[in-house]
């Protein structure tokens, strides 16, 4: 292809803009509405009505509903019909209204989501009640008497074998393991649980029962008393597993021919399932010892549903009475807790048995202080306060079950009964744990009186106040009593000598203080905490509680001016001396500030405090810090910077950014945000001055440009630098800082060779080519308004950019360089126009500097010819079969550029355009729809004045089918 002489097409942007605007036409709405049902009228009258009228006024008209979906409906929503059908299921005639009422009542009494399940308490008990003492356990080893009889055995032999199995339940081969550590003990219990499942899976039901009995016997043993609550949790897990296996087994026997409904009755159960169920209960009845018999039967409580209607209720009453025969009060209270747990799962509506368990507990409460217990504690060297805490999980659970949705009258009665007991601190503690927070809060003063009457030696009063504080953090006491409640509580808390006990209690009451009082009271509480936790660096062992204190304060105090004016708040933060904890606390403070600070601030108290907090976060960054953590910290610091505003005091704002740059130099996203902030500051200054800068504001925007120019090179990300150089150059131009803008743009061009061929994005290597092309296109669009430097040559920035593109090492088999050349042609064509498409106010671009000087136009044309020559040479080199697609795409791109920006009245340029069209369609790989639309556009353009040459060209452009 021969070289051509370039001529830019003359553009009249205003007239083109007007011609391309959409036509505005008035819309007559009348009675029309797009959602209104359409009625087609067949009118016999021929009077001049509008075509397609929706009027239905004709006397002899027939309405037709053309919407096929509407015609299928009779006016009723089909989804509503389905919903109505599902809400009113067909009921069998045998179900009476009374039965429905009973079931509805039971459903209302079912345990809801507001009931804290046992599973949530399990982990806390296991972690709290530990021991270093050695433990022992009896492992079941199996027995030879449980061999399966042959099919030919007589019935009498089966009976005899069954009796032998029952006798062997407690006398099977056992192995006692001594001197086990706590972890070994837990592992052995887990082995038993696994053995139970394996025995059941292999149809060795009797062996499974023996394992459960042996495990249940362990609950009679209190030789290592501190571990008993954890032992209870582990053993009852096995009991729960066993109960579930037996229930599922009997349920499956009822599935023939139809599975049982969820709300089945004993009448729905077949005889085989009932017989199997009875057989299990007969086996359990043969267990000689009370404790294992009680626990195993409780585990199978749900199976009573298969036998009789009232079986569960009767069994609960009987087992409740049986517990009275257990002599050890600790064993008895946990047996009651298990019975209440199973009862709440199986029949939560049977409240009487729950209440009976509680009142029986009260009746036997004095046993705790009896001689036998005291002797046992002396033998095991356990103090009374420690011993009493062993009861807490069981009593708390019993009271939680009893108090759940209980009427106020019952709760009041239970509280009165607790008052009548001597040494009732343990019960009082559980009452405050388990009763509704609203109930406790309204009687807070009464509870404080009861706490005062308790014996300090038996149960520490600070634990009682801690339990009271938990309730008061969820519900509010009467307003008139709040101050006296806080004073009474803090009198006790501040006297606690153990730092651990003190902070555990103080942390709870901080929420009550923040919830109901001002910063004065909160400051006093913080001062007291600092006083108690500073000696011997006790705070180092209480970081979780101290963090909780901070979070509670931040929950209720969102006025940071008030918060940082607290005398003791920052000294309190100084107690967090472990780096990781300190950073977490700082992050929580910043998160609350960003979330709740509504207006930008210039308060020096807030700024100094938050700057210190952000610096703490920033200084935690090191070479090992993960990228996600860096992003998280940068996000919080940027949120702080965004909320700092000095109003019209722009110089103070810039000074803050200078200080922030020095403080946060290790976090690149923060530096980038600061550059954006300063650029925004310069633009805001220009907006205030309405583009007419005074000497002072002109100096200020130059200072902003200097800030950005100095800061950008410190960034490591090459594309961040490129984009910020370009953006800062645009800001400088907008504020008439021409030399600064020139420096920014030259700096951007100078670092183009540093762009790597691939970059890491989210841990993956990706080609940088597409990002570089995007940047260059943005850069080219800016160059239209940048005036040439008087000491440099014509179009020196454009030439510099193109030279860098020429020398850049592009990827192999890449067309990126040629695409940049094609992208530069519209810029050069726009520069040759008499008036530019866009300009910057008060900045003289090249249209003013050169005023259409023929030498300037000649330089542009010469550069365009060079670029087109480079593109054509590249197209010639793409001759191989595998390159024709790239060749066609580039040819079509250059054709579009010539069509839009070249003067096609020039015959050579016109012929080049036709050749490019033919080349792009030569192999039939060009998008047909795009080609058709392009031809239509050319034909439309040909209809305009001085565009007749398009008609001749259209005749020479043909569409070729795909090969």
Curated annotation (Swiss-Prot):
Transmembrane segments: none annotated. GO terms for biological process: endocytic recycling; protein transport. GO terms for cellular component: endosome. InterPro entries: VPS35L (IPR029705). It is found in: Endosome. Residues 38-71, 85-111 are annotated as: Disordered. Residues 52-63 have a biased composition (Low complexity). Keywords: Endosome, Protein transport, Transport. Component of the heterotrimeric retriever complex. Belongs to the VPS35L family. Acts as a component of the retriever complex. The retriever complex is a heterotrimeric complex related to retromer cargo-selective complex (CSC) and essential for retromer-independent retrieval and recycling of numerous cargos such as integrins. The recruitment of the retriever complex to the endosomal membrane involves CCC and WASH complexes. This is VPS35 endosomal protein-sorting factor-like.
